Curated annotation (Swiss-Prot):
Natural source organism: Agrobacterium fabrum (strain C58 / ATCC 33970) (Agrobacterium tumefaciens (strain C58))
EC number: 5.3.1.24
Domain of life: Bacteria
Pathway assigned in UniProt: Amino-acid biosynthesis; L-tryptophan biosynthesis; L-tryptophan from chorismate: step 3/5
Catalyses which reaction(s): N-(5-phospho-beta-D-ribosyl)anthranilate = 1-(2-carboxyphenylamino)-1-deoxy-D-ribulose 5-phosphate
InterPro entries noted in UniProt: Aldolase_TIM (IPR013785), PRAI_dom (IPR001240), RibuloseP-bd_barrel (IPR011060), TrpF_fam (IPR044643)
Keywords tagged on the record: Amino-acid biosynthesis, Aromatic amino acid biosynthesis, Isomerase, Tryptophan biosynthesis
Gene name in the database record: trpF
UniProt KW Isomerase keyword: yes
GO molecular function, one term: phosphoribosylanthranilate isomerase activity
Name by which UniProt lists this protein: N-(5'-phosphoribosyl)anthranilate isomerase
CDD domains noted in UniProt: PRAI
Length: 220
């Protein structure tokens, strides 16, 4: 079974068209100004129209206030809100009530002890995104090109639905799928030639590997 594939940090029509054509289930736009993948909501809204109906549009925010969320929801019309900051369970409930949209909560993972951070959000978040904890000194909560020990996820309750993120690329995606029960994969830096610059050849290479894996015994 082919996992969901979310390509995050899209900024151009060419890369958006390519990931949708190759079969991305989700396309992510980042609304965090410190990120090299940041995009203005009005531009993201125009790009999102090209993906509408073919892939789910995900708005990625980091501790955004209501005014900014209002702008994003109005201009982008996302299918999903991804909260990648320190938003509390109460904040998630408030956001879900305000916008009536599914919420994916990002949880930063370095070791097994970090899995405990998932528990307070169970029953509130519609899905989780398990990302590698940012290296010391990084201003970015995600997109740092680092991964974590995926074997620690074996202890995670099977009821927890999650996308796996952090340092994924064509060279390790098969291992990630074999080692975890992730229902989806989230990539950003793994399909880039430079921070914030998506590479069409890397996008193609990644989808080639995923498609080959999905056809094999493990994906049958």
């Amino acid at each position: 079974m082919k996992p969901d594939i979310k390509i995050c940090g899209l900024k151009t029509p060419e890369t958006l068209e390519r990931v949708v054509r190759r079969g991305a289930s989700h396309v992510g736009f980042i609304f965090f100004e410190k990120s090299p993948r940041y995009i203005e909501p009005d531009l993201a809204g125009r790009l999102a129209e090209a993906a509408r109906g073919a892939a789910k549009v995900v708005a990625v925010t980091v501790d955004a206030d209501n005014d900014y969320l209002d702008e994003i929801v109005d201009l982008v019309r996302p299918d999903i809100l991804q909260l990648h900051g320190s938003e509390s369970p109460e904040r998630l409930l408030h956001i879900k009530a305000l916008y009536g949209l599914p919420v994916m909560k990002a949880i930063s993972i370095r070791d097994a002890a970090d899995l405990a951070k998932i528990e307070p959000y169970i029953g509130i978040a519609d899905r989780f995104l398990l990302d590698a904890k940012a290296p010391a000194g990084s201003d970015l909560p995600g997109g740092n090109g680092v991964s974590f020990d995926w074997t620690i996820l074996r202890s995670l309750d099977e009821s927890v639905d999650y996308m796996l993120s952090g340092g994924l690329n064509k060279d390790n995606v098969a291992e990630a799928l074999a080692e975890t029960r992730a229902s989806g994969l989230d990539l950003s830096s793994g399909v880039e030639s430079a921070p914030g610059v998506k590479d069409l050849s890397k996008i193609d290479a990644f989808f080639d590997v995923v498609n080959d894996w999905s056809k094999g015994p493990k994906g049958a």
